[in-house]
A protein has these predicted regions:
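The feature marks the mature, well-folded catalytic cores of soluble enzymes
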Residues: 1-221
Length: 221
C-alpha cells in the first residue's frame, strides 16, 4: 500500500466513525451575496478601487458623464489610429457617430456572417459590458445587447469598453447574481488577451497565443 492509499484509507475510516448526523456539514453559499445597496460614498470608493485595479493591469481609464461618451470613444479610437471599428448589435448608435462622420472611418456591424478574417482586420471593437468586479479589476461580457461575441473581443487590437458606475460591484459573488448562466461569459481585466485556437484557423491547433492589445475603459457616472 502506498502512502497515498494509506492516507485515503485513514480518511475513509475516520468518516465512517462519525455519527450519521455529523457526516454532512452544510457549507454556506450565500457569502458576499445579496449585499445591501452601497451608499454614494461606498460606491465612490468601489469605483476608485476598480480604476486602481484596471490601471495596475495596464488598462487606460477615462471617467466621463453620459453625454461625453461619444467624445471619449472618438478620442480613444483616434489615439489608437483606428480606421475601422466593430460595433455589436445593441450598441447605442450615437456612441460612434462622431468618430464615423469624420475622416475615412468605417463601422462594421458584428453580425454572425462576419468572418474571422474580417474581425482580425478590424482595428478596434467598442462594447458595453454585463458587469465589473472592482477588487479584481475584471470586466465581464455575456454577449448581451451592446456586447460582442468572445472571438471579436479577443481578436481586436484595441477594445474600448463602456462601463456605467452602477454596473461595478465590489466582489465577484455580487456580480454573479446578475449574470445569466445560459449565456457565454467572457472575463478580462487588462490589455493581454488569450486568443482562442478554435476561433482562429491561422493558429496551430491546440496552441493558445498571448497577444498584447490596448484596453480602454470608459467609466460613465
Amino acid at each position: 500500500m502506498t502512502s497515498r492509499e494509506d492516507f485515503l484509507r485513514r480518511v475513509r475510516d475516520a468518516l465512517e466513525a462519525l455519527p450519521n448526523d455529523e457526516r454532512m456539514v452544510p457549507v454556506p453559499r450565500n457569502y458576499q451575496r445579496n449585499a445591501p445597496v452601497p451608499s454614494a460614498e461606498d460606491q465612490a470608493e468601489i469605483v476608485e478601487l476598480f480604476i486602481d485595479r484596471l490601471k495596475h493591469h495596464g488598462a487606460q481609464v477615462h471617467r466621463v458623464g453620459a453625454d461625453e461618451i461619444p467624445g471619449a470613444i472618438d478620442s480613444a479610437l483616434r489615439a489608437h489610429g483606428a480606421r475601422s471599428a466593430l460595433a455589436p448589435d445593441g450598441l447605442p448608435e450615437h456612441w460612434l457617430r462622431r468618430w464615423e462622420l469624420t475622416g475615412e472611418h468605417r463601422v462594421l456591424d458584428d453580425q454572425p456572417h462576419l468572418s474571422i478574417l474580417d474581425r482580425e482586420r478590424t482595428d478596434a471593437v467598442v462594447t458595453g459590458c454585463a458587469g465589473a468586479v472592482a477588487d479584481a479589476g475584471t470586466l465581464i461580457l455575456d454577449g448581451g445587447p451592446g456586447q460582442c461575441r468572445r472571438d471579436a473581443a479577443v481578436l481586436a487590437d484595441c477594445h474600448i469598453c463602456v462601463v456605467r458606475v452602477e454596473q461595478i460591484d465590489y466582489s465577484l459573488p455580487q456580480v454573479l447574481d446578475k449574470l445569466d448562466p445560459r449565456r457565454s461569459i467572457t472575463w478580462f481585466g487588462g490589455p493581454t488577451a488569450m486568443t482562442d485556437p478554435e476561433a482562429d484557423s491561422g493558429k496551430v491547433g491546440g496552441v493558445i497565443e498571448e497577444t498584447e492589445r490596448r484596453l480602454v475603459v470608459v467609466i460613465v457616472g
